[in-house]
């Protein structure tokens, strides 16, 4: 079946696209909100994501249209505006700018972008950047190693868009392997792909969209990171540890024993952010061992605990997402679930029993729309599987 982005491209340009780039979305069952503090994470790429039908343009112009957003974007590949423009294409301007700082870009492209799921919670921003970068590299005959691709995509969000994300999203979308759990240390970028044990019960990945799309640019995402940094900086000061600049401080720099000794000196909000970090770090480590042993029930329980910590210690999540989380906790056949992504609107993810998928979708949908009837037609549910990361 022909992709919608291909159909639209052919209608606009009266030719077939040169190629179709793809980057998967991701879920991160464990490791929420700690990648920017150099924590450890668990992740999986899924078989839904961003497609872009494209064709090279020798004149160096980038011309893009999204099926998810209005207005076409256009700019020169070697003359990206210094300041973001405030629209959906800022992520791609940032990607071109970051790539152009290391490589000579001469060839542009025309492209039509299509996301296969609603926006919010599955790292669509990282996916579209990586999808675009893979196409831009191909037409300019540039080869990026996986970690270089990850860091270029991250820099586009950090330095151009202005979102202080860590590298969780990009790493999951690049490094993942089907039927494996990515176990990544975001401090030194070491990682392991843990195969799904033959003894593990089968599972599917369910995605429940709240009906509320989110943008990190207008959320408390960056504030939460500042609170984590502030907690780390204060703890280092109380303990008499050597410390550098505030910008370069992370909770990973502070041993748990120091937190235990001085946590009562912290403002309550900073203490709770740190509590989430240390408990989530431990869950990510324990989760990797559960996955290795094939203990899906144990792993799922950790995912539920992660969701609870995100609500009460990290304090993210709107009423709608909290309701979805509550419903998931009380639904037979769901091994574990939590907010997906930052948790500011968007969606929830769950690891579910394949034999109970339809019953789960019915129960979650009925209970959620009973609580929020105004979201009927905007709420949606999907079932996915693990997938390989992007391949250049």
Regions found by a protein language model. Give the residues of each.
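Gly/Ser-rich oxyanion-binding loop with an adjacent helix/lid
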Residues: 1-21, 27-40, 74-79, 85-200, ...
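Short, charge-rich binding segments
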Residues: 43-45, 53-56, 103
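A short catalytic or substrate-binding loop motif that flags glycine-/basic-rich loops and adjacent residues
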Residues: 33-35, 44-46, 281
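Glycine-rich phosphate-binding loop
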Residues: 344
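C-terminal nucleotide
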Residues: 1-26, 30, 51-85, 180-336, ...
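Short Gly/aromatic-enriched secondary-structure transition segments
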Residues: 38-45, 224-225
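FabD-like malonyl-/acyl-CoA
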Residues: 127-129, 347-352
